[in-house]
């Protein structure tokens, strides 16, 4: 590298995925059952937003809030209830069925950790680690 120049390296892609090559995706994803997402953190009816990385289960072929009993996945994309008025996808999301993820960057983590029941429902296909900062700047 020529002297006097600085090279900055930034992490790109989904910010909670630790290793893209480790991820397993559920084939076609699933459609959101909006009646399941009633917690105020998702917003109000007609304007709800579910961020990528949210832990979900599938009931009757639709994505629902995980009950920590059914097999649990992570949403691969943001979903917005009314995409005609807001930026984002429609009512469907791809799903991560496993891989290596930054636990502290998931929207359901509290103080950097997922609930034990959620992690149990995800099974052994998911490996979690702390991000400890992602930005690497070198010269």
Feature map (PLM): residue ranges:
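Surface-exposed, low-hydrophobicity beta-strand/loop segments enriched in small/polar/acidic residues
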Residues: 1-139
């Amino acid at each position: 590298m020529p002297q006097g120049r600085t090279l900055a390296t930034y992490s790109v892609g989904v910010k909670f995925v630790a290793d893209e090559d480790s991820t397993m995706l559920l084939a076609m994803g699933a459609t959101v059952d909006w009646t399941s997402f009633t917690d105020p953190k998702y917003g109000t009816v007609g304007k709800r937003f579910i961020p990528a990385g949210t832990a979900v289960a599938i009931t009757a072929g639709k994505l629902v809030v995980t009950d920590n009993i059914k097999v649990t996945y992570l949403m691969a994309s943001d979903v917005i209830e009314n995409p005609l008025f807001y930026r984002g996808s429609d009512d469907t999301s791809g799903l991560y069925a496993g891989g290596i993820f930054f636990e502290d960057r998931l929207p359901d983590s509290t103080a950097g950790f997922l609930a034990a029941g959620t992690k149990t429902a995800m099974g052994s296909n998911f490996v979690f680690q702390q991000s400890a900062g992602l930005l690497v700047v070198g010269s």
